[in-house]
Amino acid sequence: MTNSIVLVTNEINPYRKSFYDGLYKYCESIGIKFTVLLMTKVEHGYNWDYEKVKSDYAILMKGKHFSFPISNYLNWEVLEDLKNLKPDIVIVAGSYFYYTNWMVIAQRYKLNYPVYFWSETHLQEARAYNSFLLKIREVIRRILYSKFDGFWFSGKLSRQLIERYARKDAKYHFVPNLIDHTTYLNTSASLRNQRAELRAKWNIPLDNEVLITPARLSWVKGIHTFLDLLNEAALRHKVTMLIPGTGDFKDEIELKIKETGLDVRLLGYQQQDSVIELYSLSDFFVLPSLSDPNPLTCIEALWCGLPLLVSTHVGNYPEVIQECQNGYVFDYANKTDAVEKIDKLLSSSAEWRKSAADCSLQLANKYYNPNNVIKRLVDDMVRENSRIEKSGHKCP
């Protein structure tokens, strides 16, 4: 019988909170205690307020943060917390490099719980690692993935990577990113009728094609590389690109904007209501990432009924895009094709845009409806755990 589920992760951020809230509520409704163990309040480089996202089901552990050679955590309280919580199932998230997660793995036999890893990375991510670091990563990944009893995977691409390293008897559960979908769906639908007023508010010409890219201003988001492609589009002079977000790559992006002369607006950090406004006045969602495991913004765009244009490095593109029906996936390795897809999007008819919006909403409901996903996930894991208990060996 499953009485306790524990998720060990680096932080609770505003984008994941609705998912954790949903897990807690559903687990509580079927008599399961759900707990989140946190390694830190807020990851370095992010600016949300921990006081607004903290929850009664979450425990902030004491520990130490390391920034070299990569960001890492060592939370010595995790073992005591696990002893007290007596979990039947443990999920670790964030990174398999975290020392805290290593401690959880090391104690799974002693404390008798299976460990699942929430893996969102995929084989098509571009990383700025040198060959030595790549080799180290490969060795560590191969060792640690073989230790996990199962995985939460975010889509087709992430499962492909997992299967390369996991044990043959590993269990798999599809866990897409989830958001507070009703807020995006209902608010954006209402605001669509106020497009002229919203464009005037943000000083955007009504006849311009508006692209929205909510993203950190960082190298991995590929904004600087996408602007070179956009600059070759036939309708580039009728485009306004909105980028709500902050980051340490801002100067480089501003330089690229100056070089191209494109109408690209760096809007800085924006609250959720402002971001939904921006979605509602936009024509298309664009995410040109060079590395992006499982971005939530794609799911926000689906629930707002937008057509999408994303790169092949975006990990959930097989789930969020039906090629030509609600958008396009482009490859930086094929520059000509990428520019052609930008042109197709910008010159698309009103009829296609309406059909694409309907398709986006259908995909959102199919893959990213929290009411369906959370119940299926918990019920499947409980059934799986029950079978393991009956077999007489909880930890394979």
Regions found by a protein language model. Give the residues of each.
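Nucleotide-activated donor-binding/catalytic signature segment of Leloir-type glycosyltransferases, i.e.
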Residues: I253-Q270
